[in-house]
């Protein structure tokens, strides 16, 4: 009797152990579906397939199951489970998007603003909301790095819609004598009406050819960009792929 009880305890333990990983969680979910469904509404053949898929198998049983062909009913059931998991992933992504919309306070922009005058430049700095980070590129046509920086900021404006990216020609600032071609492009960063960072001849920080990812890394080194909103959604997708 003791040996039988011990063997039963070991079998129970092994049965629980098969449900510890992600696949075990899915098996438990299948078992839950079987138990929660109305018994009269499930065909006996489908009920048996669900039972087999949710029950732990010994090695011999696994070999036997692998050796036989998959029935049409099994294929349809597995396909249905995959559709259920796909719906679950879509639901989680929608929840994340709703959360981001609720937590993303303040205005949203999404493109680079062209400032035409010094007055418009000052008005942008002084009247924008205090929580908004403003990145301004002071440039001139034909100066090395200016076009590349403007293109990079246009890409970043899409990735960081909560940041206001602007550009203005040095000759339009009203202080053109302070912004000679030797110091262009100059990148100024404001928040709450205050200058928090300035980078003179910022193109010298990059290679001959540089792109948005280079400018993004540079600004992140100084903590000037918020966390990208898409980050959490990508992480959720990675977790969903791990479950599969």
Curated annotation (Swiss-Prot):
Interacts with CRX. Forms a complex with the beta and gamma subunits of the GTP-binding protein, transducin. Its main location: cytoplasm. Residues 1-68 are annotated as: Disordered. GO terms for cellular component: cytosol; nucleus; photoreceptor inner segment; photoreceptor outer segment. It comes from Mus musculus (Mouse). This is Phosducin. Belongs to the phosducin family. Residues 1-244 form the Phosducin domain. Gene3D superfamilies: Glutaredoxin, Phosducin, domain 2. Keywords: Cell projection, Cilium, Cytoplasm, Nucleus, Phosphoprotein, Sensory transduction, Vision. GO terms for biological process: regulation of G protein-coupled receptor signaling pathway; visual perception. The keyword Cytoplasm applies. The modification Phosphoserine is found at residue 71.
